[in-house]
């Protein structure tokens, strides 16, 4: 496992973004872990978060023209990712985000920032039902752009109502790569080597066995 993945897990734990225990999800499932990226909510947190996204983007050698952060959670993520890519790698990439309701005055429209054109790198926190990605795809298509890849913080690798995960459904429906800073297997690998949290490994393995995807 790459160093940036280990560091991200430790960072998420230190901010209570990632917690182990017993959590009731919206789906009704009881999960042995919970991830809430909204708790990355200070300048220092967001700066580091952007660096982890940038590391994942560079590690996967993604080709793209513009970064798109869909409203609402994707807006600060897209912003901090663009700054991190410049500060760490010297890449000055344009960034764009949408507003939920179009304005009919001022700059108008529902997009802010760079024009949404060419190959688009979409950044968000997680994909649960895939609804936000589908809404973003409508916006990308309406502007004549192409979705190049999606990068999220965590891939739960968990089945939805069918046999596929939400991430797999997005990859199938839009023929694009969905990458993540970390995924469920990374959490398991971390638990296997960390004495402080290793007690959660059995419940995590059991959850993956019941709900996980390949």
Swiss-Prot record:
The record's Pfam families line, in alphabetical order, gives:
Pribosyltran
- List the InterPro entries: OPRT, Or_phspho_trans_dom, PRibTrfase_dom, PRTase-like
Q: Which organism is it from?
A: Actinobacillus succinogenes (strain ATCC 55618 / DSM 22257 / CCUG 43843 / 130Z)
Catalytic reaction(s) noted: orotidine 5'-phosphate + diphosphate = orotate + 5-phospho-alpha-D-ribose 1-diphosphate
Q: What is its EC number?
A: 2.4.2.10
Cofactor names from the entry are: Mg(2+)
Q: CDD domains this protein is in?
A: PRTases_typeI
Q: Which EC class does it fall in?
A: transferase
Keyword Glycosyltransferase appears in the UniProt entry:
yes
Q: State what this protein does.
A: Catalyzes the transfer of a ribosyl phosphate group from 5-phosphoribose 1-diphosphate to orotate, leading to the formation of orotidine monophosphate (OMP).
Q: Which HAMAP family match?
A: PyrE
Which gene is annotated as encoding this protein in its UniProt record?
pyrE
List the keywords (alphabetical).
Glycosyltransferase, Magnesium, Pyrimidine biosynthesis, Transferase
Keyword Glycosyltransferase belongs to the record:
yes
Q: Name one GO biological process term.
A: pyrimidine ribonucleoside biosynthetic process
> What GO CC terms are in its UniProt record?
cytoplasm
Residues bound to orotate: 34-35, 128, 156
From the UniProt record, give the pathway where this protein acts. Answer: Pyrimidine metabolism; UMP biosynthesis via de novo pathway; UMP from orotate: step 1/2
The name this protein goes by in its record: Orotate phosphoribosyltransferase
The UniProt similarity line reads: Belongs to the purine/pyrimidine phosphoribosyltransferase family. PyrE subfamily.
Positions contributing to 5-phospho-alpha-D-ribose 1-diphosphate binding: 26, 72-73, 99-100, 103, 105, 124-132
Subunit organization: Homodimer.
**GO molecular function terms noted in the UniProt entry:** magnesium ion binding; orotate phosphoribosyltransferase activity
